[in-house]
């Protein structure tokens, strides 16, 4: 990546890594059994962050599956969109840290879609409530 966008991504990646270092410092203070080398290797924290984001993202399918089983039909509960946004946001930060344009593009577009769908759900519920008055 080059130009202003590349510089912005690099700056954001450095800030995310600084945050990971801070988290590592706090973890080694709170959990003294953790190795001190964790502070010098923020990429280990970021790998955990990446897996956490992937876990949040995967939960949306489990929630959708359980809701569909409960109702004996295919449904997408509102929690699906919240987990999509949570997991997508964490994975987007992880993609910025990795400076991976393909990953950033996919997660960025996904976040837009999840937020838009949540907007439609909220608007539909507000419309249904106001219609019932």
Where are these regions (language model features)?
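Alpha-helical membrane-protein topology signature
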Residues: 1-133
């Amino acid at each position: 990546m080059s130009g202003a966008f590349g510089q912005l991504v690099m700056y954001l990646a450095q800030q995310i890594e600084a945050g990971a270092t801070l988290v590592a410092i706090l973890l080694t203070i709170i959990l003294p059994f953790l190795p001190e080398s964790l502070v010098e290797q923020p990429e280990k924290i970021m790998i955990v962050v990446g897996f956490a984001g992937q876990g949040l993202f995967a939960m949306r399918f489990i929630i959708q599956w359980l809701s569909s089983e409960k109702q004996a039909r295919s449904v997408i509960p509102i929690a699906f969109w919240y987990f999509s946004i949570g997991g997508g946001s964490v994975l987007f930060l992880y993609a910025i840290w990795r400076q991976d344009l393909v990953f950033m593009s996919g997660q960025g577009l996904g976040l837009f879609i999840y937020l838009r769908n949540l907007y439609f759900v909220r608007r539909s519920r507000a419309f249904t409530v106001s219609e019932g008055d």
